[in-house]
Structure formats: structure tokens, C-alpha cells
């Protein structure tokens, strides 16, 4: 993750007050660019290979937590729950599991009077980019957590961002502009670790049962012809309803008034007869 490269660049200035990680003149790694977190969809590098072996062959954990940098301006740390819309191909139990972990993490910071946690619409992070350490875990039904926290060895200032000052669902406990030290970031990270460990220890049986349930559902779905409703098809259905919004659509072929996924697929492609009443 560029650790030695960034460290050497930071330490190049003898004046400790002028040290900075800015304007690094080269990529961290010539094959994968910014850092090895971008390599988990290919596992091309030895670091990501070894981590994937641990995660998906040796351990198969229920939770994976990736600490990263940096947080959005006017906050301290961005984390789960992530912004909408989430990737609809995942099991809903996985998504609500991520939300539950996020609630435990933000609540822990609030209880310890540590403001500045942002989530949902307050963050740019989602579940859609699927090449990183925590997002590839979703395809294994593992609760993947990512936090992006501010801070570096040189003290910094949390800037004034007016839109961040009023509490809302994205940032329920805003932080005021202030001087920020590296120790503060470490303290926050430790609290977040304890929040995850506390949740895992208290809800061990539930987490184990949930990953079993998600795995069984995946196997069952793979053993039959299974369809996923995509936004394109739901948009087509919305257009049909919009065109006939003052009428009702009655499906003639379905005696039980239940539309199966394969039937709905044909219906949205206009291959199924329906009657407007």
C-alpha cells in the first residue's frame, strides 16, 4: 500500500513542521497504481493473493474490516452504512448486516463523545465498486467494512464546512472545526475496532447463522433457473404503469396472482398478454 514509499517521502524534510505526504512523484506500484486495494478483483500481486487465501480459504470470517484514509472534509471518519442505492445483487441479509455493524460503530463513537462520523448520504462510499478488499468480500457473504479516517503525523485543521454542521441522518454528531492530531485518529480507530469486536462477541450465533443462511440461499438459487429483477426491467414496468396510471393491469395467465421471475421477465419484454380494466 505504498507504506515505505510514502514514509520515505514524508521523512525527506528535516523540518518536522514542514513534512507532508502531498505531491508524491510516482505511483505506489507500477502494475496496480495507487495501492494494492485495487487488486482484489484480480489478486495479481502477492499481497492480495495471500490475503485472499486467508480470507476465503483458511478463515472465511463473518466480518472483514478495512481501515483506510481519508475522510471527507469537515468530518473525521466515513463508514457504514453506505450511500444508496446499494448493489441489488447482494443478499438483503448482507446489506442489513452492514447497516447493523455501522450502527454499532457510530453509536460507540457517540457514546465516547467522539464526533465526526459520517455515513449514508454524508459519504461518497457505496457497495458498487467491487474490486477492493472489503467489496469483493460481499460475494462471499462476508460483512465487509470500510472506514476512511483523516489524520497523519503532522497536525492538521478540520476545515469549516457549513453543510456539515447541522446534525442529520448522514452525520448525526457533527464535529466543529479544530486542530487535529494523529493521536486523535488512532483513538478513533481503536474505538471502532472495539465496536466491531463487541458486536461480533455479543451476536456471534446470529452472525454464524446469517452467513450459513446466505450461503444456503446462494446454493439453492444456483441449482435452479433464477432471475434477478434489474433496474432496466423495473423501469419498463414503471413506464407501463405510467401509461395506464388510471387503469388496472390484470395478468390473465397467472391463476394465483403471483408473478414468477421468469414470467415477469417475459411480461416486461411484452411477450405476455395482459388486460387493462
Where are these regions (language model features)?
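Structured catalytic-domain cores with a bias toward divalent-metal coordination
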Residues: 1-277
